[in-house]
Amino acid sequence: FMEKVSSPAISLLLALLCSFLPVNMTAVFGGLLLCAHAFALSLETFAVTVGILFIMYAVYFRVAPGQGYVLVLTPLAFFLKIPHVLPLVLGLTGGPVCAVPLACGTVCYYLMYYMKNNEKMLSSSETEKMAERLLYLVENVLNNRNMLLTILVFAVTLMIVYLIRRMSVDYSWYVAICAGAVSNVVLFLIGGLVMKASVSIGVVVLGTLVGVLVALIVEFFALSVDYSRTEYTQFEDDEYYYYVKAVPKMSIAVSEKKVKRINSRRRSTRRRR
């Protein structure tokens, strides 16, 4: 909405600057850009945006300051139409704290989505409708059923994947991915009916399948173990009994190379004789 901020030169400059700064600064610059575009629409849109971002960043920096990449990647995943990848992958590689930046990123996306789809109404200059637009904006952003359902389902799915993948069972990561995928689809279906939200089941199923594929790729690089060679052992000390399950990592057998040395001195002496 603000042409000066949307110029390629500004975008390139911010990209270069953020590449040298911590990921949390990238999230801060993203919030400032969002506020600038909101200011270009109207004063009340700017006020609501600043209020939402202030509360959101206060919660984020208090609870999960080290998960800035989640806050940055969440709106990007929504724009790429692959948001269902996030709860599955974060459940494997992160923990419950990732639900906070995931929810904050979801709020940012829906805020931008609403501003884009209601540009004409929000940019109206009629002063008598300013209070009406303000209430309408707050009502549609904070009480958006699709947004609330998405935050709730993603948080529950992330927790399911996280809890299962930490269990001491064989192939726990694969079980966690399958359970998370099923719960994601089922929760969106049930939640859409209960909350009367507009949910496209086909899009949810397709997005979940893409999430399963990405999660399997992450599992391949993050956890390569051979469950067929699992070993169990137990021992004790003065205070505790210990029961240990050892799962070896996958390894590629390297064939031993035999180097045969030929003594050239012996050959030369034989020739002289």
Where are these regions (language model features)?
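Hydrophobic transmembrane alpha-helices
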Residues: 1-31, 37-38, 47
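Alpha-helical transmembrane segments and their membrane-interface exit regions
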Residues: 12-20, 36-40, 53-61, 75-83, ...
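Membrane-helix interface "capping/anchor" motifs
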Residues: 17-28, 40-41, 58-69, 92-100, ...
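Hydrophobic alpha-helical membrane segments of integral membrane proteins
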Residues: 27-29, 46-51, 66-74, 86-90
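Generic multipass alpha-helical transmembrane bundles of integral membrane proteins
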Residues: 77-78, 86-197, 208
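Juxtamembrane/interface segments at transmembrane-helix termini
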Residues: 118-119, 166-170, 197-201, 217-236
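Acidic, glycine/proline-rich intrinsically disordered low-complexity segments
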Residues: 202-215, 249, 253
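Short, highly charged, low-complexity non-transmembrane loops/tails of multi-pass membrane proteins
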Residues: 225-271
